[in-house]
Amino acid sequence: MNKKSIRDVDLKGKRVFCRVDFNVPMKEGKITDETRIRAALPTIQYLVEQGAKVILASHLGRPKGQAVEELRLTPVAARLGELLGKDVKKADEAFGPVAQEMVAAMNEGDVLVLENVRFYAGEEKNDAELAKEFAALADIFVNDAFGAAHRAHASTAGIADYLPAVSGLLMEKELEVLGKALSNPERPFTAIIGGAKVKDKIGVIRHLLDKVDNLIIGGGLAYTFVKALGHEIGLSLCEDDKIELAKEFMQLAKEKGVNFYMPVDVVITEEFSETATTKIVGIDSIPSNWEGVDIGPKTREIYADVIKNSKLVVWNGPMGVFEMTPFAEGTKAVGQALADAEGTYSVIGGGDSAAAVEKFGMADKMSHISTGGGASLEFMEGKELPGVVCLNDK
C-alpha cells in the first residue's frame, strides 16, 4: 500500500482524530453485534500505546443531520471501555467548546468518543466548515473506517484537507488484502458473485472478468443469466432489462478465457417461508409457478470443487435466501468449501456474505472478512475510494 499508516508517523503527545466505523446494529439501546468495535481495537490500542490522545469519531445509523437520542454513541463508548479495560470518556457533541474542553483535559493514552458525526447536516455533504471544526480538535487525522471509505464525507475525507492524514491498521489491512487480490493475485483466482440483483454487481463482474480465472454465479442474479441462455425460470427473480448484458458478460468470459460457472440445478419453492416445501430440479426444468431460491446439490459440488482447486477466492453475495433455513444450504455449502479448502486464501467481501459466514459459525475459518460491504464492492469495481485517496502518500 502506498499510503502512510499510523506506523509511519510520530504519535506521542499528539491529538489524533481517528475516524472509526462504529455503525453497529442496536436494539433498545443494546448493541446486538459488536464486530465493528472489535475490528477497530488494534488501531485504538496502538494509538494508546504510542502515547497519543485518542479522539474517536463515527456515525451510527441515519439520523439525517439532526440529533436522535437512540442514535447517540453512549452505549458504544461504554462497551469500548469494557473491551479496552480502561476509562473511555464520551462527549455529547462532535465539535465545539465542550468537545474542545474535553480534548484539552486529555492526557497521553486517554480515549474520548465524540458524538455521532451524522447529527450534523454538513457531515454527509462533506462541508468544509464542519471538516475544519473537526480538524481544530486534533494534530493528525487517522482514517480507520474502511466501511465508510467510499463516502466523501467531512469526517472521512474533508478533514484531510486540514491535517496530516494516515490510515489506521484496519484500513491498511483491507487495502493490502483487496489490493493484492486485484493487482497481483495468486492463481487460480476465483470470484464468487451472488446476491439478488445483477444491477448491483455489474461493475464488479465487468472489472473481475479481466482478473479472474473462474467466475462463479449464484443467488437471485443468476436467473437473469439462466434466462439469457434461453431457459424458462418460472417466477424466479429476473431483470429483463439486463438480459442482453448477461449475454455480453458470458461472451466476454469466453473471449477472455475465463471459466464461467452457473447453476446446473436449483432449489425451488412455491412460497417464501421457514416451512416452505422445496424441490430440486435441473436448471432447464423450473415450472412456471415456482421460483428458484438456492443453488442445488450438484451445483454445490461443482462450486466446491472449483473452490478447492483455487489459490485465491473472493466471495461477494450469497447463493440463495440464506436467512431462511430451507433456502440456506447453497450459501452454507460455499462457506463450508472455503472453510475446508487448504492453501486457499479466502476474502469475504463484507455485507451479506460476511453475515452468512458469521451465522454459520465459519468466520474464524476465513482468511479475511472485509468490514465494508459497499466499500469493498466499489474497490472491486476498480473505483477510487474518497476516504483512501485523501490520505498522504508514503
UniProtKB/Swiss-Prot annotation:
Give the catalytic activity: (2R)-3-phosphoglycerate + ATP = (2R)-3-phospho-glyceroyl phosphate + ADP
Biological process per Gene Ontology, one example term? gluconeogenesis
Supply the enzyme class, top level.
Answer: transferase
Q: What pathway is it annotated to?
A: Carbohydrate degradation; glycolysis; pyruvate from D-glyceraldehyde 3-phosphate: step 2/5
Q: Where in the cell is it found?
A: Cytoplasm
Modified-residue entries (Phosphothreonine), positions: T299
Please provide the record's keywords in A-Z order.
ATP-binding, Cytoplasm, Glycolysis, Kinase, Nucleotide-binding, Phosphoprotein, Transferase
Task: Tell me the residues on which Phosphoserine occurs.
Answer: S183
Q: Which Gene3D superfamilies match?
A: Phosphoglycerate kinase, N-terminal domain
Q: Sorted alphabetically, which Pfam families does this protein's record hold?
A: PGK (PF00162)
Which Enzyme Commission number(s) are on file for it? 2.7.2.3
Binding positions for ATP per the UniProt entry: K201, G292, E323, G350, G351, D352, S353
Keyword Transferase found: yes
Q: Can the keyword RNA-binding be found in this entry's annotation?
A: no
Q: Name one GO cellular component term.
A: cytosol
Which residues does the annotation say bind substrate?
Answer: D21, F22, N23, R36, H59, L60, G61, R62, R118, R151
- Which superkingdom does the taxonomy of this entry point to? Bacteria
What GO molecular function annotation could you give as one example from this UniProt entry?
A: phosphoglycerate kinase activity
Q: Which HAMAP family match?
A: Phosphoglyc_kinase (MF_00145)
Q: How does it assemble?
A: Monomer.
Q: What's the family?
A: Belongs to the phosphoglycerate kinase family.
**Known PANTHER family for this protein?**
PHOSPHOGLYCERATE KINASE (PTHR11406), PHOSPHOGLYCERATE KINASE 1, CHLOROPLASTIC-RELATED (PTHR11406:SF23)
- What's the protein here called? Phosphoglycerate kinase
State the organism of origin: Bacillus thuringiensis (strain Al Hakam)
